[in-house]
Amino acid sequence: MGVSRVLYVEGGTPLKGELRVYPAKNAALPILAASLLTPEPITLVEVPRLRDVEVMLELLAHLGTQYAWEGRTLHLQTPEIKSTHAPYELVGQMRASFIVWGALLARAGEGHVSMPGGCAFGFRPVDQHIKALEALGAEVWEEDGTFHARRTRPLSGRVVFDLPTVGGTEQAMLAVALGGEATLVQAAVEPEVVDLGHFLALLGAEVEGLGSPIVRIKGAPRLKGGTYRIIPDRIEAGTYLLAAAATRGSLTLEGVRPDHLDALLDKLWRSGHRLEVGEDWIRFRATPDPAPFHVEAREYPGFPTDLQPIATAYLATVPGQSTVVDRIYPDRFTHVGELARMGAELYLRDRILTVQGRRLHGAQVKALDIRAGGALVVAALSAEGASEIEGVYFLERGYEHLTERLQALGARVHLRESPVALAAD
């Protein structure tokens, strides 16, 4: 027998209290990749201390970056690129690490990156990344599970994406930031993409149109260093709001960007909950009798796909019928079977999930990706009885100090070891 860590949750306690939102992981990762573009020192203030960030730093160190933590502040410098190969053992752990491809191509003239890994839900191709780099003038090919690219001049051109793509947009921005120039059509408008653009502007690139479908970027021959503060994590903020809603609690979030959460806040308001919103804070008070609603996850400013599983868990506690559709990842429903183990009534047909809300009960469940894990935590907090959630690894990739922060809000949760049968040789 071996042991694994599980999150033990005794449900039924409304969450109450105040919470300061941590910086956004999905903004930090491409900004970390962008640090490869300059030999000058970079300081990032308030960086999330998550497993995904540590994996990205391991990859950057392999490529030539020197870094040091000072509390939650991160100091980085890449005097030279020591390797242009991003190996599978690092890239395979996290899809976002694929973004170093464009930065390597810009700084070193070539980049070789293994097929990305990360959360296993749906089909998430990299064809738009390849299309962007080829449109900008790079030679791109794939061999034995590794993507290769090289250039003979600074990359420039016009990229027309087939659809808005966060990763593809970020990849193109990094590829041209050092001496190149590009117009990106159907660019992603997510806050994390905008944050990367602001960071590149700090380093010396000229960026226009951020937050719109057409972005123009003109790189500088040499980028400088600087100090930057990453935006708050809208997905973390949304997860805690939905947890408070599911447990019929009350929550004040500080250090948040309410304008990044318009789609969720509108749904919560229409569900009957009370909300007060300031420039950088949200006060939430749950109604005891919330109404069901329809969720359709789509590109920003629509409802975030990363909050779709967590919203599903909340709706499973709301009497009446709700429906959930994900236009970004239509098969992102790895959480459905596990929620059903807790008594949730869920029916998936033609990629439309129908949710019939009811009181949930505790169960042994397993997180299969980061946000499915968040969904199971929300469900367990609201359920009657105790739950054990396996897959703590995924939770630690997406939620910093999750156990401690939930405890501070009154939740009865803790990590503990659970026996696991080992496979025979």
Swiss-Prot record:
The answer to whether the entry has keyword Transmembrane is no
Q: Output a single Gene Ontology CC term carried by this record.
A: cytoplasm
Q: Does the keyword Cell wall biogenesis/degradation apply?
A: yes
Fetch the InterPro entries from UniProt: Enolpyruvate_Tfrase_dom, Enolpyruvate_Tfrase_sf, MurA_subfamily, RNA3'P_cycl/enolpyr_Trfase_a/b, UDP_GlcNAc_COvinyl_MurA
One Pfam short name: EPSP_synthase
Primary localization:
cytoplasm
Supply the EC number(s): 2.5.1.7
The lineage's top-level taxon is Bacteria
Keywords from UniProt, A to Z, are:
Cell cycle, Cell division, Cell shape, Cell wall biogenesis/degradation, Cytoplasm, Peptidoglycan synthesis, Pyruvate, Transferase
Q: Which GO terms describe its biological process?
A: cell division; cell wall organization; peptidoglycan biosynthetic process; regulation of cell shape; UDP-N-acetylgalactosamine biosynthetic process
Q: Which SUPFAM superfamilies match?
A: EPT/RTPC-like
Record PTM 2-(S-cysteinyl)pyruvic acid O-phosphothioketal, positions in chain: 119
Offer an example of a GO molecular function term for this protein.
Answer: UDP-N-acetylglucosamine 1-carboxyvinyltransferase activity
Q: What class of enzyme is it?
A: transferase
Q: In which pathway does it act?
A: Cell wall biogenesis; peptidoglycan biosynthesis
**Locations listed in the record:** Cytoplasm
Binding residues for UDP-N-acetyl-alpha-D-glucosamine, per the UniProt record?
Answer: 95, 124-128, 306, 328
Per the Swiss-Prot or TrEMBL record, the active site comprises 119 (proton donor)
Q: Where does phosphoenolpyruvate bind?
A: 25-26
Known catalytic reactions: phosphoenolpyruvate + UDP-N-acetyl-alpha-D-glucosamine = UDP-N-acetyl-3-O-(1-carboxyvinyl)-alpha-D-glucosamine + phosphate
Q: What is the role of the protein in this entry?
A: Cell wall formation. Adds enolpyruvyl to UDP-N-acetylglucosamine.
Cross-referenced PANTHER family: UDP-N-ACETYLGLUCOSAMINE 1-CARBOXYVINYLTRANSFERASE
**Family per similarity comment:** Belongs to the EPSP synthase family. MurA subfamily.
Q: What is this protein called?
A: UDP-N-acetylglucosamine 1-carboxyvinyltransferase
Gene that specifies this protein: murA
